[in-house]
Amino acid sequence: MSNNRRRGPMGGPGRGMAPGEKAKDLKGTMVKLIKYMRRFYVPIVMVIIFAIASTVFNIVGPTILGDATTEIFKGLVHKVSGGSGIDFDKVTHILLMLLSLYVASAIFSFIQGLIMTHVSNNVSYQMRKDISEKIHRMPMKYFESRTYGEVLSRVTNDVDTLGQSLNQSMTQIITSTTQIVGVFIMMIRISIPMTIAVLLTLPLSMGLIGLIMSKSQPYFKAQQKHLGELNGQVEEIYSGHNIVKAFNKEESVIEEFKEVNGKLYNSAWRSQFFSGAMMPLMQFVGNLGYVAVTILGGYLAIKKTIEVGQIQSFLQYVRNFSQPITQLAQVGNMMQTTAASAERVFEFLEEEEEIEVEKDAVPVDTLAGNVTFEHVNFGYNKDQTIINDFSVDVKEGQKVAIVGPTGAGKTTLIKLLMRFYDVNGGCIKVDGQDIREFKRSDLREMFGMVLQDTWLYNASIRDNIRYGKLDASEEEIQGAARAAYAHHFIETQPGGYDMEINEESNNISQGQKQLLTIARAILADPKILILDEATSSVDTRTEERIQMAMDNLMQGRTSFVIAHRLSTIKDADVILVMNHGDIVEQGNHEELLAKGGFYADLYNSQFENA
C-alpha cells in the first residue's frame, strides 16, 4: 500500500513510543497467554501426551542398556571362570527391546513436533488476525500518537517471536520436566547414595542459573527495545527517502542509524553472551557430579552392592538429569522474551476501541445531508483546545469551503464530522440527529473523500477505482474515470485498467494518483463529499478539468472543500474562514471580498501578482 503520510490518512499530532519493553507482569501475561491458547486445547493435550510418552521411553532406555551391559559382563566373568559365557540370545532380545523403545520414542517425538508446529503457527495466525481486526476498530487518535514502526512491530516482530518461542519452549518444558522427574525416580531405584551425590550439585547449578538470568534480563529488554526503534527508523527513512536526498541528510541519517544499530548490537551480544555462558557452566557443574558418581559407583561395585550395568545406567542418567535442568534454565530466558512479546500484543488487543452504538442506532438511509455544528469544542489533549465554540449550519446540497492558515483547525473539523474523534463539547448533527447516535460505519458510508495525500494499494487501476464501490460494473468504473478525466491517461498505460499499481505507487505520477482517488469518490456516489486539498497536487490544466468534474459531482450534494488555493472555491455557497479554531468570517466569495477582512487579505496575497 501507499500512504504518503506517517501518522494517519488525515494527519494530526504524533509522538513515538519506545517498543519492546520487558514484561511488567510476567505471571499475568502468561495467564493471559494460556487463556488465549485454550482454543487449541485438544492439540496441546496431544502434544503433552506424545511428549511425555517419547521422554518416558528415552528414560527407560539406559536401564535396559544397563541390563545388556550386566549380562555381557557376567558372561565374560563366567567365561573366564570356565562357564558357558555370554548368552547372546538374551542380549539380542534386550537390544531389540531397546531398539523398539527408541524407535517408538522417535515416532512420538516426531508427531508431537508436527502438532506443536501446527499449534504455534495457528497461534501466530490467530494473533495476526485478531490484531488486523483490532486495527480497524481502533480510534484514529491511537495511530496519530504512534509511529508506523511501533504498530507494525506488534504484527511482525512480536507475533513472530511469540510463535517461535512457543514452538521451542512449550515442548521443552514438558520433556525437560518429565525427564527430570523420570530420571530422578530411576536414579533412586538404582542407588540412593549416588543420587544424593548428584543432588549436592543442584544448589550450585541453581545459583549459576539465577545469576545468569538476572544479568541477561536487562540486555534482552534493551535488545527488544532497540530492535523496535531500528525497525521504526528504517521504515521512516525509507518512506521519506526523497526528502532525505533533497536536503542532503544522508550522512546525518546514516549516523542516526549507526547509533541505534550500535545500541542494538551492544545489547544483543551481551544478552547472547550471558545466555551462551549458561550451557558451558552447567556442563562444568554436571561434570563435577559425573566425577563424584564415578568414584562412588566404583566403590559400591567393589563392595558388590551395585552391578556394573547399573553404574553405566546411572552415569547416563546423570547426563540426562543435568541436561534438562540446563534446558529449563534456557527456556526461562526464552520465556522472558515470550512474555515481553505477548504483553505487547495483549496490550494492543486490550486498547480502548471506538465506541460504537450497538442498539437503537439511527439509520442513515433517509438522511439528506443537512449538517449542523453546535458550539463545538475540541482539542487533541486537555491542555490545548483547537476548536473553540464553533457553530455553523450547512444546508443540503450546499458547497461549503473551509479556508485559513495551517493549524487553523480545518482538517480537524472533518475528522470530527466523520467521528474519527468525538467532540469535547457541543455536538454535530446530520438532519437534526447527533452523529453519536449513528453507527460509525453507517455514518462514514455517507461520505466520499478525496484527500491531499493519495492512498492507493498494490492492485490494478480497476480495483483501486472499484474500492469506492466493490460491486461496480466495468461500465460504472470507466464512467467514473471519465468523469474524473482519468480515462485517457489510464488507456495510455501498459495494460490500461489492468495495470498493476506497485506497492509504493511510484509507477504513476502524483497528478494521476489524484485523478484515480477522485474517480473512486465519484464511483462511491456519496451523500456528503469531502475534498481536502483535492487539487493541490496537480497542474493547472488538470486542476481545471478536475474542478469541472467536481462541480458536476457536488451538484445536489453537501460538500466540504478544504483548500489553500482560493481559486478553487470562489463559487462556494458558503466560505468559512477559520483562524485559531474559530470562524472569523463567513459568507460567499463576493461578500467576503467586500468586507476587506481576513479572507480578502488571504485572497489578495495569492493573486496580487496576477
Q: Language model features by range: what are they?
A:
Residues 350, 357-358, 364-610:
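ABC-type nucleotide-binding domain
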